Amino acid sequence: MGSIEIPNCSGSIVYKTISDFIDFPDHEQKLWWHSTAPMFAEMLRVAGYDLHSQYKILGIFLNHVIPFLGVYPTRINNRWLSILTRYGTPFELSLNCSQSLVRYTYEPINSATGTVKDPFNTHSIWDALDRLMPLQKGIDLEFFKHLKQDLTVDDQDSAYLLENNLVGGQIRTQNKLALDLKGGNFVLKTYIYPALKALATGKSIKTLMFDSVYRLCRQNPSLEAPLRALEEYVDSKGPNSTASPRLLSCDLIDPSKSRVKIYILELNVTLEAMEDLWTMGGRLNDASTLAGLEMLRELWDLIKLPPGMREYPEPFLQLGTIPDEQLPLMANYTLHHDQAMPEPQVYFTTFGLNDGRVADGLVTFFERRGWNHMA
């Protein structure tokens, strides 16, 4: 079994209090709790969540999420490798600084994951949803059921992929969940990766994703205009483009309010490529977009991403190794109901860069705008 060291932030009274009363069902869950909860608790405290919300959020995480994280990762154990991190770990915390909102993402894993019963982890997400749905009002699975059926492999697809040895080193993650924590409540989201479905059907990821969302638009026509605008932009880049659709996400709420996001991976890491993603090749030219473009250029200059062509690396990194690689760029485009154009969001992929240099760049960026609470 693995062992852990409690991080310095373990002084959180909430983490310590909950830990005093836990009767863990197995050692794996104990390791997961003590390696993630101290940082989780500290992030909630720093972000200003009240004490009641902190206890509720950590209680949900302990009882309804940790049981779906699988075996605790070590360098020697056999475990499911998730696309969520370059080390294959299935859990990640994040913080929306401008809104002081904590969120976490995980790929649900159960005992059948990676076995002949569920070789590509298609089914465990349903068990995870069964645990979460009674905890939060307003969860709606209409979009999820539609997209999952179209974009993840079924048992017949799985058998075909295995019999023909088609997967190889292909990343096997197909779906994951995210919780945006708003007070003591949460908004549930899903992310879906169609790469295995593309292998099984012979269709491109782009075709699978856009066709599925177009079918979704039959019942939700208010999403069609931004979808068509995005497809026109993607198609305009041509068949040899370094940018291609990779995954999509949606909110698991009332379909009339749910947003769909389509993610584009860009192998060409340059400021010009990021500017093109941000403006959709000049299609977005309103005042807000242009103001954001100037901020993007400033941040690029501060962080100094090394330019070049970057393939998504294989295989996963060994636990404990220091990364010596750079990832491609990524952008997502949010399809809002009744809006003509999608809303862009670009990612500065700083993985593998010096953390201190990146932090210094962000501090400078925040201070220039008077966002001292974020710096």
Curated annotation (Swiss-Prot):
Catalytic activity annotation: L-tryptophan + dimethylallyl diphosphate = 4-(3-methylbut-2-enyl)-L-tryptophan + diphosphate
Keywords: Alkaloid metabolism, Transferase
GO biological process: indole alkaloid biosynthetic process
Organism domain of life: Eukaryota
Binding-site list for L-tryptophan: I83, L84, E92, Y193, R246
EC number, UniProt record: 2.5.1.34
Transferase as UniProt keyword: yes
Role played: Tryptophan dimethylallyltransferase; part of the gene cluster that mediates the biosynthesis of fungal ergot alkaloid. DmaW catalyzes the first step of ergot alkaloid biosynthesis by condensing dimethylallyl diphosphate (DMAP) and tryptophan to form 4-dimethylallyl-L-tryptophan. The second step is catalyzed by the methyltransferase easF that methylates 4-dimethylallyl-L-tryptophan in the presence of S-adenosyl-L-methionine, resulting in the formation of 4-dimethylallyl-L-abrine.
Family assignment from sequence similarity: Belongs to the tryptophan dimethylallyltransferase family.
Protein name: Tryptophan dimethylallyltransferase
Species lineage: Eukaryota, Fungi, Dikarya, Ascomycota, Pezizomycotina
